[in-house]
Design a protein with these regions (language model features):
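Iron-sulfur (Fe-S) cluster-binding modules
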Residues: 1-123, 135-136
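Catalytic cores of enzyme domains
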Residues: 100, 107, 112, 117-295
Length: 295
């Protein structure tokens, strides 16, 4: 065990000395609402630094380490520059069309952008908005961008830096497309904002993506898309442009995950092994679902 780096052991994984010290007493499962029978909005944890929560020092240490890694610096710079740039002004004259027509145009525009491989639309459910945030946009457009699988699989050989870089690149390319799509909507005379990148946001993206037909939740607690599998990153656009919603899809993820144990086999900390099988479809804020095992 090192000061900053953990080690694999015969029993799984031992976190670094610093992370063991910073680990809060309040379990992430408790914050996430495991076992709660009442419906409520989720509470933000990772990558949120605008309010205090038990995991803020843990998450901040992770981000600081990444910022001071030379290979990561340019990606943080790019993220900051995009956020500073903001969005164009909303056109004073609105272009009118039927919701179904707008939905078709939005998808065509999104898929024409280099940072979008899949796109779906859902009406915003207020329960997706984190409890520290407020947002009144009616619609969310979720876009997904595939990651470079050949690079990402280096993570299985513990070549983590290469994998981290492709994750950052994909997040930011997806964010760029979300910003461009938001600007296009604003040019039509409607409010819109793009959100993305490796940081926290006001919307819980996964339930929105499920409602938008992007994919289904796998037992590894991440989204599975029919074309991209789990190997993609998402960003989204919140807007008041009148749209038509997509529907959730059934692509057989539950059946597939019932026979595949790869995420268990290749998880060094054995977190998936602790979660899968024993923690499927438990009550989380009144909803019965799969969930992360978050000690």
């Amino acid at each position: 065990m090192g000061i900053l780096s953990g080690v694999e052991t015969a029993n799984g994984y031992e976190p670094s000395w610093l992370y063991q010290i910073l680990k809060p007493k309040k379990s992430g499962n408790v914050i996430n609402g495991l076992g709660e029978a009442e419906k409520r909005a989720p509470t933000p944890i990772y990558h949120r630094y605008d309010h205090w929560h038990p995991w803020i020092l843990y998450g901040a240490t992770f981000m600081i380490r990444k910022i001071f890694t030379p290979q990561h610096r340019k990606y943080f710079k790019r993220m900051i520059e995009m956020d500073k740039q903001g969005f164009c002004d909303i056109a004073t004259e609105q272009i009118n069309a039927k919701p179904e027509e707008w939905a078709k145009k939005v998808k065509e525009k999104a898929l024409s952008l280099p940072g979008c491989d899949v796109v779906g639309i859902a009406e915003v459910d207020p329960i997706w908005i984190f409890d520290k945030d407020t947002d009144t946009h009616k619609w969310v457009i979720v876009i997904g961008l595939s990651m470079d699988y050949e690079v990402l699989k280096n993570n299985l050989d513990r070549k983590t830096l290469e994998a981290e870089i492709t994750v950052f690149e994909t997040y930011l390319d997806s964010q760029k497309s979300a910003f461009e799509l938001a600007d296009w909507i604003r040019e039509q005379g409607y409010d819109a904002k793009g959100v993305g990148g490796p940081k926290g946001s006001e919307l819980n993206t996964i339930p929105a993506a499920i409602a938008a037909g992007i994919g289904q939740l796998g037992k590894h607690d991440s989204l599975m898309n029919e074309q991209l599998g789990p190997c993609f990153r998402m960003s989204y656009v919140l807007t008041d442009l009148p749209l038509a919603a997509d529907k959730p899809v059934e692509i057989g993820v539950d059946q597939f995950c019932g026979t595949c144990d790869l995420c268990t086999k290749f998880c060094p900390p054995d977190i998936s092994g602790k979660a899968i099988g024993t923690r499927r479809n438990e009550m989380v804020r009144r909803f019965r679902q799969m969930h992360p095992f978050f000690q």
